Regions:
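Transmembrane alpha-helical hairpins and terminal membrane-anchor modules
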Residues: 117, 122-139
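Hydrophobic alpha-helical membrane-associated segments
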Residues: 2-9, 131-142
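Transmembrane alpha-helical segments and their cytosolic interface motifs
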Residues: 76-123
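Charge-rich cytosolic interhelical loops and cytosolic tails of multi-pass membrane proteins
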Residues: 16-85
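Cytosolic/matrix-facing juxtamembrane and C-terminal tails of multi-pass cellular membrane proteins
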Residues: 135-164
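Short hydrophobic alpha-helical transmembrane segments
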Residues: 3-4, 105-113, 125, 129, ...
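Intrinsically disordered, low-complexity linkers and terminal tails enriched in Pro/Gly
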Residues: 38, 119, 160-164
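Transmembrane alpha-helix/interfacial motif
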Residues: 1-22
């Protein structure tokens, strides 16, 4: 029961730190996936790419009847479609992102505790930086995978609706 309560509070803390994490990642993955770059046929970053951004943006703006729709508004609409379908992998990707965010928060907390006690040990700094970096990188990737899956599920649902 104690582990559950601790996990519950770490999950809450990780939710509070979400905006800070996004700043270190260069922005929200959903915003970056919905931002086209001139001369590039994909959005995202080197490890997680989304090749259907222009199609998704076009369909979302038409559906929202708003040629200046914000990225948040577009992603919110895509989420409403993908969450409405139990055949998608979106809940799995969401859970993986939430879990990796909790792991990142836990690694930060543990590093602070370790380094406050062993601040004179140079190797502890290396271990802490390595663990936090790996957790941060994994969290970033999972955020992009989740956002890409939401947009992919949205496009799949729209395409299926147009063929029936």
């Amino acid at each position: 029961a104690v582990a559950y309560v601790i996990g519950y509070f770490i999950n809450g803390l990780s939710s509070l730190l979400d905006k800070t994490y996004y700043k270190t990642m260069g922005g929200m993955p959903s915003d970056i996936l919905l931002t086209q770059i001139e001369g590039q046929n994909y959005t995202g970053y080197k490890r997680v790419k989304f090749y259907e951004a222009s199609e998704a943006i076009e369909i979302l703006k038409i559906e929202l009847n708003d040629s200046n729709a914000s990225k948040g508004k577009m992603f919110g609409r895509a989420m409403s479609y993908s969450n409405d379908d139990e055949k998608t992998r979106v809940p799995d990707f969401n859970a993986q992102y939430a879990f990796s965010r909790v792991i990142l928060t836990t690694s930060l907390l543990l590093s602070i505790l370790w380094l406050s006690k062993y601040y004179m040990e140079w190797w502890m700094w290396l271990v802490a930086v390595f663990i936090v970096y790996m957790s941060w990188r994994r969290c970033k990737e999972r955020g992009y995978y989740y956002a890409r899956e939401v947009l992919t599920a949205y496009l799949r649902k729209k395409r299926n609706a147009n063929t029936h």
